[in-house]
């Protein structure tokens, strides 16, 4: 997304060979050959890295000019429209031409340097180049003249993203660079110049990936003023409260001008600033004036930073389509400014890169301030809090989270089965399309919900296209593992209770795959026809079941409990039978309706009570722990501002700005229906025609499930609405609440407060909203109320004892941040269903519950249906009995360990990540916060690990040889622990530690 809306201009023209194929760097072949010869003759063709950085001038103010383009992987145009340069009526932007033009300009002058970031675009461009051009680019990279920063597939959002998906997309991009350029192309610096606020977990992940620092453009306007005054625009971010420093320490720099050029110095074809006119005979001569202005600008900017180095970003959104206009003027500026040194100037200007600038800061050997909180929420003005996008486009946010779940299942089965998953009886299975689509969705205008509508539709299209090849892969893998070639069917619409196969079949099988490293109990819910059903487990034992009718759709749903082994599957058979079957009658529970004045649902652990007059949730009791807490839950809506006397700022895709502090109730009461069976008890609440909820309690469950359905939000009254679910309790919380950071570590939040500066709160609601990726909770030190989410949402505690989460929003006015559309979400995006999981526990025992429950929700079991009675997979074993149950692990993982990644890496290698999912000191009831040691030998059942190499988090460097720059901080010096010797039989994980391995494997013949 752009820092500002710039005037449109004309881009560079295209050029093609006689065959119609694009020629290298848009240059005639003779010119390319000539420039290539110059490149080969250029001195200093050394390995890339800090040693290729340009010389600076000691004793002078060195101004590092960073030529760059910021290429959104979708925003106003789709990814393909941006790459090819289509629909320039929406935005002048063609990434293929930018890269062509930049390479040409770099070849023309050896001092020039350029930075590129988005591998989603660069990899596509790279594969379209000739061998000759590729060799030219490799040499530019080796010389440090073309530098990659960040290196992920995209520049991911930091508020609406889950850490697992962040790691995956960074791994995808960095692997492309490693495979293409080796260590020469390895980024040293993270470059998050456009995301709208910055999470602590993101910094921790960057540090664990081996980055030496991060630079970004956006921080809160109040924070920035304070930092400039204190000269704390650069600092060391201590990004984990669990990992021993400096493992998660990351040098952090705030750029002086967001990420655009200084005012008056934008020389792109999209800009209107005058070029450098250095001919004194011209009436347009301005060189002397520009030099004077630049010297004043550099000196003023330098006052806010601690060293004799400062940085200026020379570029912005989709700039450098005609790179010559930029570089020609920068060449002149550098020459003219440096000539003033003969007249006593102490300013030295040079082409540089983020890594080279960081290198000079490190060599300054200063003591740097330390930050331990995060950079949320972000505001660029008193009434301009970028907290709306935490909740924008909730349907897309859920689709992204479901796709992450499905991708992990796909990756795991591909890893467990090996090549037979890719080529088998169902065709060619491939995890790459979904992996790439998921990477694209992490972009800061994708999962954030801040693109135009047609772009959001295209993001969903990419995900849907990625599911298909994974479904083929799953079919191949499951056929091999089960020994039966079934007609596997995948119901993608189970979230809205639609599955034509289960709704029309009299007899079928349900294969339940569990991606967790531990066995799981799960209640299976499938839409069916009315009737009774006989369920058999893998051992042919009858399983209890019930059919519940949904009031929202009228479709009955079949429920039965499934027990599934770790990293494996169980196959259940379902048969529709007559009411006369005695076996069915004994195992089938009929729903019962109750007219008791006390409206409540209960199991062996919990009782939830509802107010008899309003139908709203009013009380939760934890029976075995004797905890009771009044909890009032209802839906409310904020009236979205369209601007007022204080500010013209409206609520929009990015900005949350309610017109008043207190929301309106959606309804003061709910019409209710009570359903009780042996397996589940439910209260169906209907608030309005567009807002309903089912409060559900399964047998054996320690949490309450609230399944809400909202939309389409009515706006006939011309009021935009932002819908929240709010939980009110009498807990005395002192303005404090807690939210997760990208689904991982938890941060304390305090109402109307920032740890880093004294806040002037100008928006009492929006200024207290924070991103919630997986959980939010309040506690009085004795009891803790936790709400888990099924997607990223905005959340807060607007009064003591209260929690709220924004579930949906529909707005009638654009917020002026460049999208140019109101967030209306026509069609299916306007109707959204989701779930909140409510946990009440003692503060001491709460972490053990919410950590493990969040893992189960993120990596939920995958249901695959089949008619049954398929032919044998093995041609030479016609009599073989199909396998009804399977586990990919010979022993379960401990509760504190999560299998973060199990995926194919190469023809005979796998990528394996194991993480400790508890924070330091978080759990004392079950000792789940202690270090844990694993034996990887003989752990997996379908393959044997023959060699194990440990890498950094993104798997692009061996851990033993990876090193990062060292920084001195204002906090006591830190000892740097040595890398432990790798012993596959003894892998120890410290709290919140992730360890990454590339494993050479040999698959078993009959896995």
UniProtKB/Swiss-Prot annotation:
Top EC class, one word: hydrolase
GO BP, sorted A to Z: mannose metabolic process
Protein name: Lysosomal alpha-mannosidase
Positions of the catalytic residues: 194 (nucleophile)
Keyword Hydrolase on entry: yes
Cofactor: Zn(2+)
GO cellular component terms attached to this protein's record: lysosome
Domain of life the protein comes from: Eukaryota
Binding positions (Zn(2+)): 70, 72, 194, 444
Main location: other
Family: Belongs to the glycosyl hydrolase 38 family.
Localization of this protein: Lysosome
Job of this protein: Necessary for the catabolism of N-linked carbohydrates released during glycoprotein turnover.
CDD domains cross-referenced by the UniProt entry: GH38N_AMII_LAM_like
Signal sequence interval, chain numbering: 1-47
Gene this protein is translated from: MAN2B1
GO MF annotations, alphabetized: alpha-mannosidase activity; carbohydrate binding; metal ion binding
Native organism: Cavia porcellus
Disease per UniProt entry: Defects in MAN2B1 are the cause of lysosomal alpha-mannosidosis (AM). AM is a lysosomal storage disease characterized by accumulation of unbranched oligosaccharide chains.
Glycan-carrying positions: 131, 308, 343, 365, 495, 540, 639, 686, 760, 927
EC number of this enzyme: 3.2.1.24
Catalyzed chemical reaction(s): Hydrolysis of terminal, non-reducing alpha-D-mannose residues in alpha-D-mannosides
Disulfide linkage: 53-356, 266-271, 410-470, 491-499
Free-text comment on the cofactor: Binds 1 zinc ion per subunit.
């Amino acid at each position: 997304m752009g820092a500002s809306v710039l005037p449109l201009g004309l881009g560079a023209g295209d050029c093609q060979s006689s065959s119609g194929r694009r020629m290298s760097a848009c240059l005639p072949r003779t010119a390319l050959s000539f420039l290539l010869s110059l490149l080969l003759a250029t001195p200093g063709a050394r390995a890339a890295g800090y040693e290729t950085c340009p010389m600076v001038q000691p004793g002078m103010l060195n101004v590092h000019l960073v030529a760059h383009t910021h290429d959104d992987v979708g925003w106003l145009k789709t990814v393909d429209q941006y790459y090819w340069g289509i629909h320039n009526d929406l935005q002048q932007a063609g990434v293929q031409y930018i890269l062509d033009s930049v390479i040409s300009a770099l070849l023309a002058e050896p001092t020039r340097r350029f930075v590129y970031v988005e591998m989603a675009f660069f990899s596509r461009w790279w594969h379209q180049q000739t061998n000759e051009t590729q060799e030219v680019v490799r040499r530019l990279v080796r010389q440090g003249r073309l530098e990659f920063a960040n290196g992920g597939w995209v520049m991911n959002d930091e508020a609406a993203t889950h850490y697992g998906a962040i790691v995956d997309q960074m791994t995808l991009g960095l692997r492309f660079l490693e495979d293409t350029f080796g260590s020469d192309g390895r980024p040293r610096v993270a470059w998050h110049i456009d995301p709208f606020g910055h999470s602590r977990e993101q910094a921790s992940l960057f540090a664990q990936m081996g980055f030496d620092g991060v630079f970004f453009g956006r921080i809160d306007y109040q924070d920035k003023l304070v930092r400039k005054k204190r000269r704390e625009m650069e600092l060391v971010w201590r990004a984990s409260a669990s990992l021993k420093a400096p493992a998660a320490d990351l040098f952090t720099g705030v750029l002086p001008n967001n990420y655009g050029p200084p005012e008056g110095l934008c020389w792109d074809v999209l800009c209107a600033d005058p070029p450098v006119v250095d001919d004194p005979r011209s009436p347009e001569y301005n060189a002397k004036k520009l030099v004077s202005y630049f010297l004043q600008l550099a000196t003023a900017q330098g006052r806010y930073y601690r060293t004799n180095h400062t940085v200026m970003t020379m570029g912005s959104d989709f700039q450098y389509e005609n790179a010559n206009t930029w570089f020609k003027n920068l060449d002149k500026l550098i020459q003219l400014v440096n000539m003033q040194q003969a007249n006593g100037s102490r300013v030295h200007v040079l082409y540089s890169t983020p890594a080279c600038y960081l290198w000079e800061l490190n060599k300054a050997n200063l003591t740097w301030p330390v930050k331990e909180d995060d950079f949320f929420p972000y505001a660029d003005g008193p009434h301009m809090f970028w907290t709306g996008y935490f909740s924008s486009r909730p349907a897309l946010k859920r689709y992204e989270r479901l796709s992450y779940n499905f991708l992990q299942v796909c990756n795991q089965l591909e890893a467990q089965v090996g090549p037979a998953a890719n080529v088998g009886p169902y065709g060619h299975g491939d995890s790459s399309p979904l992996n790439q689509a998921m990477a694209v969705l992490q972009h800061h205008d994708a999962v954030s919900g801040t693109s135009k509508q047609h772009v959001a539709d295209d993001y969903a299209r990419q995900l849907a296209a990625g599911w298909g090849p994974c479904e083929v892969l799953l079919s191949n893998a499951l056929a091999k593992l089960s020994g039966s070639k079934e007609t596997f069917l995948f119901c993608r619409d189970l979230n809205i209770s639609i599955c034509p196969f289960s709704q029309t079949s009299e007899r079928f099988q349900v294969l339940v795959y569990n991606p967790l490293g531990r066995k799981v109990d799960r209640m299976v819910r499938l839409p069916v026809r009315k009737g009774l059903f006989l369920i058999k487990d893998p051992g042919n034992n009858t399983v209890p079941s019930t059919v519940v009718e949904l009031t929202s759709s009228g479709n009955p749903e079949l429920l039965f409990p499934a027990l599934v082994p770790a990293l494996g599957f169980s196959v259940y058979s379902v048969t529709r039978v007559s009411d006369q079957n005695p076996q069915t009658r004994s195992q089938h529970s009929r729903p019962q309706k109750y007219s008791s004045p006390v409206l409540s649902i209960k199991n062996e652990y919990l009782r939830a009570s509802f107010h008899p007059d309003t139908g709203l949730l009013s009380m939760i009791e934890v029976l075995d722990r004797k905890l009771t807490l009044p909890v009032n839950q209802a839906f409310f809506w904020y009236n979205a501002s369209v601007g007022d006397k204080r500010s013209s700022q409206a609520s929009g895709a990015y900005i949350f700005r309610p017109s008043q502090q207190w929301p309106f109730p959606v309804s003061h009461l709910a019409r209710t229906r009570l359903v009780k069976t042996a397996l589940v008890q439910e209260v169906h609440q209907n608030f309005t025609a567009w807002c309903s909820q089912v409060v559900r309690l399964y047998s054996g469950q320690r949490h309450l499930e609230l399944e809400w359905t909202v939309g389409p939000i009515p706006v006939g009254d011309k009021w935009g609405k932002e819908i929240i679910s709010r939980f009110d309790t009498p807990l005395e919380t002192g303005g404090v609440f807690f939210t997760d950071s990208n689904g991982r570590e938890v941060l304390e939040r305090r109402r109307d407060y920032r740890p880093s500066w004294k806040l002037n709160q100008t928006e009492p609601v929006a200024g207290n909203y924070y991103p919630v990726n997986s959980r939010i909770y309040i506690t009085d030190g004795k009891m803790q109320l936790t709400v888990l989410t099924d997607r990223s949402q905005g959340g807060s505690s607007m009064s003591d004892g209260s929690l709220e989460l924004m579930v949906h929003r529909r707005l009638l006015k654009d917020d002026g941040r460049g999208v140019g559309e109101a967030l209306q979400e026509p069609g299916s995006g306007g109707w959204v269903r989701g779930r909140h999981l409510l946990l009440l526990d003692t503060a001491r025992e709460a972490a053990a519950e919410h950590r493990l429950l969040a893992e189960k929700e993120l990596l939920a079991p995958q249901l695959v249906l089949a008619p049954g009675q398929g032919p044998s997979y093995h041609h030479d074993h016609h009599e073989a009995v199909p396998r009804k149950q399977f586990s990919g692990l010979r022993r379960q993982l401990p509760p504190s360990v999560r299998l973060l990644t199990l995926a194919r890496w190469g023809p005979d290698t796998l990528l394996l990540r194991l993480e400790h999912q508890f924070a330091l000191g978080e759990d004392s009831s079950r000792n789940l916060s202690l270090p844990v040691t694993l034996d990887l030998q003989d752990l997996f059942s379908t393959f044997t690990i023959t060699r194990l190499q440990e890498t950094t988090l993104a798997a692009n460097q061996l851990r033993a040889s990876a090193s990062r720059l060292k920084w001195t901080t204002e906090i006591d010096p830190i000892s740097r622990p040595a890398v432990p010797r790798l012993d596959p039989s003894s892998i120890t994980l410290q709290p919140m530690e992730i360890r990454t391995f590339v494993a050479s494997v040999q698959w078993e013949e009959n896995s």
